[in-house]
Amino acid sequence: MKKAEMGRFSISPDEDSSSYSSNSDFNYSYPTKQAALKSHYADVDPENQNFLLESNLGKKKYETEFHPGTTSFGMSVFNLSNAIVGSGILGLSYAMANTGIALFIILLTFVSIFSLYSVHLLLKTANEGGSLLYEQLGYKAFGLVGKLAASGSITMQNIGAMSSYLFIVKYELPLVIQALTNIEDKTGLWYLNGNYLVLLVSLVVILPLSLFRNLGYLGYTSGLSLLCMVFFLIVVICKKFQVPCPVEAALIINETINTTLTQPTALVPALSHNVTENDSCRPHYFIFNSQTVYAVPILIFSFVCHPAVLPIYEELKDRSRRRMMNVSKISFFAMFLMYLLAALFGYLTFYEHVESELLHTYSSILGTDILLLIVRLAVLMAVTLTVPVVIFPIRSSVTHLLCASKDFSWWRHSLITVSILAFTNLLVIFVPTIRDIFGFIGASAASMLIFILPSAFYIKLVKKEPMKSVQKIGALFFLLSGVLVMTGSMALIVLDWVHNAPGGGH
């Protein structure tokens, strides 16, 4: 349900052709026709952000003549909004429940502003560096190390996005089947076991779609994802006024104990005191606990869209950096409001009882609810069809790294696809909660893509500004902030894992 696949996009027509005198750095060349690119912009899936276009292997050099963009301002806003929003929205209420309303709004504001600033750095670097490819900017800045850092970060982000989608299948599909079959006792039924269902969906639906050599109609699923999330937000707001408070804590705790699909540690504080009107239904504005550390990575994970910015920029009609920044400002502000409303109303519905995946929390209280069942079906369809879109760039990166000089082979193509899907399924089965995926990927790959790489590329490639300039000093502080956020978040998350491991909290 999100972020398109990483990018070997067609090169911007106004690039310096001398920068591409050799094609030895890449084994793929990319189509520069507007029609080829435009037809794939619905493919930008928000949680991954790197859409790989089909390559033209016979081409020796990038096209350098000017090709004006053809995508309108409004459609560019939609494309970028679609690249931002994704499964991360399901974890925002959990983040608010562990930070408090005021602290969450402060963090959300800072992360959105920093993400927008990194888009500014990225656009300026692309203009000065003469490339609209994220990996190529890395190569121009730091050689092979920079290229691998960009490619690795985007691949990790894609794997995290894919895992989060399969986690949603693991969480929600058993509830849908249980609601449709009216089964009360699901003990021992394999078709109500989330792990079995993830494997089944992967084999029957995702694998066949992932074996295609091109995306075709799958590219349009990201648009469906955005619509599903808007529908989800409307339902979250409506349900706030239907779910009674205080929430029946015993019911939630029983549901948590009886299922492996919830986050046990999220409910521990609720066990230590009686649930009363003043206690359970009072919002908190500042909260600090062991789960607060996940808030920033979840927010960072939710705002990653940066590898999608460059191809959207290339296709923008009347293209200019100022115009693209206006597109970015509108998109980020719209997603800021959407994230804030989803987190706020989700939190004000369940307070400290919010689980790490908000949609699953409703089943503990409302059981079989028709409206929620429709939301679940829509979200399940969107994420299931989006996973094959996410697999494309990962497979292409692996192929490019290991077998760049070899001709296409269906056996190799299939083996890499199966391996990627198998690895992701293992993560989903053995990683206890979606919160861990949001936290780890948000703290590592997403921090690289938002903070570290854009600022490092800017410092290295924008030559006309001296290091003592305000712009370069700002980029340097941004880089150091990213390193601090990444190392600090990762350290605290690992400490939380170690601390909770003996008690089975993870």
UniProtKB/Swiss-Prot annotation:
Post-translational modification: Polyubiquitination by NEDD4L regulates the degradation and the activity of SLC38A2.
Tissue expression pattern: Ubiquitously expressed. Expressed in neocortex. Widely expressed in the central nervous system with higher concentrations in caudal regions. Expressed by glutamatergic and GABAergic neurons together with astrocytes and other non-neuronal cells in the cerebral cortex (at protein level).
Residue positions binding Na(+): 82, 386
Disulphide bond pairs: 245-281
Entries under InterPro entries matching the protein: AA_transpt_TM
Cytoplasmic side: 1-76, 124-158, 210-217, 314-329, 393-413, 458-472
Reactions mediated catalytically: L-alanine(in) + Na(+)(in) = L-alanine(out) + Na(+)(out); glycine(in) + Na(+)(in) = glycine(out) + Na(+)(out); L-serine(in) + Na(+)(in) = L-serine(out) + Na(+)(out); L-proline(in) + Na(+)(in) = L-proline(out) + Na(+)(out)
Triggers of expression: Up-regulated upon amino acid deprivation. Up-regulated upon hypertonic conditions.
GO cellular component: axon; brush border; cytoplasm; dendrite; neuronal cell body; plasma membrane; sarcolemma
Topology term for the membrane: Multi-pass membrane protein
List of residues that carry Phosphoserine: 10, 12, 21-22, 55
GO biological process: alanine transport; amino acid import; amino acid transmembrane transport; amino acid transport; cellular response to amino acid starvation; cellular response to arsenite(3-); cellular response to mechanical stimulus; cerebral cortex development
Function of the molecule: Symporter that cotransports neutral amino acids and sodium ions from the extracellular to the intracellular side of the cell membrane. The transport is pH-sensitive, Li(+)-intolerant, electrogenic, driven by the Na(+) electrochemical gradient and cotransports of neutral amino acids and sodium ions with a stoichiometry of 1:1. May function in the transport of amino acids at the blood-brain barrier. May function in the transport of amino acids in the supply of maternal nutrients to the fetus through the placenta.
Family to which this protein belongs: Belongs to the amino acid/polyamine transporter 2 family.
Protein name per its UniProtKB record: Sodium-coupled neutral amino acid symporter 2
UniProt source species: Homo sapiens
Lineage: Eukaryota, Metazoa, Chordata, Craniata, Vertebrata
